[in-house]
């Protein structure tokens, strides 16, 4: 009868507990954890099935809803679980944290105050730095002075590239739990990104002989990876920002934002916080067509166009110089000017002239022998005149203007 009773008791327990809960708790989270999870957590369970609810966790591990929500504040009062995330189901190995009790007794002749402090040792926070955030992984260097909160999609390489002040090897050295191949990097945890002596700004990658960026724009650092090279307007991405909110704040379309910052991905999962994103690009050439030969006097027109295109400018006999902007993406800053006898770049062709970005260029004949210009990015070595493959029209003796 005893054997039979034990059998029935075991069957009753098995019927009461869902088979999905008959598995050991994990001392380390297998999935991402939400921000704010208790730093004293000693066991975790994972929401590995869509049907898994808070009630399942509470009944499986015999914990109260109040305790569960205090250990996992991100679930909220309605206790919503995220599929695949790990949740804390025990703190301090089931022991209470530090408590202090004070008792006071008195008589008619004297007062005696007795203070009794009862303390149960709690495990140290997962951060090995006394003032560091939590949670962190084991083994983090003791002298860490800067931290980064890892989100889904981050890698060791991405983090080191984002900061630009340390190598991936250094990041792994400071955070050894991630492993040599970075497979142990956990979203929802803090990692060390600086120790005493780590630079506070990234090392410049400019060439030793260059004092000016190739496009004339000084780019702030760090930036989103693979950001377009012709960017001249930037915005700093704050933690919690999304692509749509950043684009809206900058007054640009989401499609343009994703095009200028391609590593963000269509779902914006690759957007880096604490880095600059591009919210505006510069044209290949921008210039003002001016009345006098020294770029003074009235402005006849303002022109700009993008790489890979040319532009015909009708001068109406009112242009003697071009004031070319310092910013632009023409290769090496080379601007080609083609002179045409008639408007709309027609009639006789009188050859080429060249200018550079950031230059005031006095035009051939100071504008008297042509009525239009065709402007594009090109170097002198590539033109047909230099290669003897074309012939210019005879230069007129008289002005056409």
From Swiss-Prot:
Superkingdom of origin organism: Eukaryota
Signal peptide range: 1-19
Disulfide bonds: none
Protein induction: Expressed during in vivo infection of insect hosts.
The LysM domain, residue ranges: 42-89, 146-193, 233-279
InterPro entries: LysM1-like, LysM_dom, LysM_dom_sf
Location of region: Disordered: 98-137, 201-223
Phenotypic consequence of gene deletion: Does not affect virulence to host insects.
Compositional bias annotation for Low complexity: 98-136
GO molecular-function term, one example from the UniProt record: chitin binding
Keyword Transport: no
Record keywords, A-Z: Chitin-binding, Repeat, Signal, Virulence
Family membership noted in the UniProt record: Belongs to the secreted LysM effector family.
Misc. comment: In plants, chitin acts as a microbe-associated molecular pattern (MAMP) that is recognized by lysin motif (LysM)-containing plant cell surface-localized pattern recognition receptors (PRRs) that activate a plethora of downstream immune responses.
Role summary: Might have a role in sequestration of chitin oligosaccharides (breakdown products of fungal cell walls that are released during invasion and act as triggers of host immunity) to dampen host defense.
Record's comment describing the protein's domains: The LysM (lysin motif) domains are small globular domains involved in binding chitin in eukaryotes. Blys8 contains 3 LysM domains.
Protein name, UniProt field: Secreted LysM effector Blys8
Organism from which the protein derives: Beauveria bassiana (strain ARSEF 2860) (White muscardine disease fungus)
Organism taxonomic ancestry: Eukaryota, Fungi, Dikarya, Ascomycota, Pezizomycotina
